[in-house]
Amino acid sequence: MAFLKKSLLLVLFLGLVSLSICEEEKRENEDEEKQEDDDQSENKRGLLSGILNTAGGLLGNLIGSLSNGES
């Protein structure tokens, strides 16, 4: 009977260890996915900011040239 108890405890312990390892890997994968999403969001914001700055500069030049032409 003692042999069965020890075997059962060993099986439970190994199961808990493997479950813990799986949970840790899952957390790492989720962190990596979140980091990738954050990087993509930053890239999109940077791209949008660049487009808006360029459009603003072009619009400013156009208005400036129109106001100079009217004088």
Swiss-Prot record:
Acidic residues biased stretches: 30-40
Gene Ontology CC terms, in alphabetical order: extracellular region; membrane; other organism cell membrane
Biological-process GO terms, alphabetical: defense response; killing of cells of another organism
Maturation propeptide residues: 23-45, 70-71
Subcellular location, principal: secreted
Keywords assigned by UniProt, alphabetized: Amidation, Amphibian defense peptide, Cleavage on pair of basic residues, Cytolysis, Hemolysis, Membrane, Secreted, Signal, Target cell membrane, Target membrane
InterPro entries for the chain: Frog_antimicrobial_propeptide (IPR004275), FSAP (IPR016322)
Tissue expression summary: Expressed by the skin glands.
Modification Asparagine amide occurs at: 68
Compartments, record wording: Secreted; Target cell membrane
Protein origin, superkingdom: Eukaryota
UniProt xrefs under Pfam families: FSAP_sig_propep
Stretches for region Disordered: 25-46
Signal peptide (from-to): 1-22
Chain ranges passing through the membrane: none
UniProt domain comment: Plasticins have huge conformational plasticity. They can display random coil, alpha-helical, beta-sheet or beta-harpin structures.
Family the entry assigns: Belongs to the frog skin active peptide (FSAP) family. Plasticin subfamily.
Function: Neutral peptide with no antimicrobial activity. May act in synergy with cationic peptides by enhancing their activity. Has a moderate hemolytic activity.
Name this polypeptide is given: Plasticin-C1
Organism: Agalychnis callidryas
